[in-house]
Amino acid sequence: MVREQRPVRRAELLLLLDLYAESQADRQQLELAISFAAALCLQSSPQSAWQLQRMCLAGEQYVRVEPAGVAAFRESALKALAECQAAPQTQLDQLLADALRSGRGRRVVLLITPRPAGIRHRLQTLTAEGQSGPGVSGITVLSAEQGELLRYCLPPDTGASAGSKAGGVS
């Protein structure tokens, strides 16, 4: 018998997080987006089908985490996520510039934002002005709303939900 070897499809992931928040409630809603980004950092490994290569956070400060080895990058990325602060004004243009400079190939650009419609409109404007370059079609804009993020991850079990499952009401 001949065993067919399939090539491993590896994609580089560029994670962009827009930490725009006007109120305390907006800031609290971004906590799930930050946790989602942290989970992506922890799941990224040389053996996975994708590997987190760069992360940019636009909040009170603009932070760019570049690769410096898998373990060092993961540690730096998690530290940046732990220390990031939301803000009513973020460096959106810098975030979009990093997204557009990412190039093509086996690269996935994921932009998590609480204002997806505004981001999509801005990307369309850049495309219409001819400033977008080749990368605009490769940017996935994901809403930071809880309902949207929970489609991709499950929140940790709380004691109440774990207790009701254990109780076995049928």
Could you describe each region identified by the protein language model?
Residues 1-170:
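Exposed, interaction-prone extracellular/peripheral surfaces
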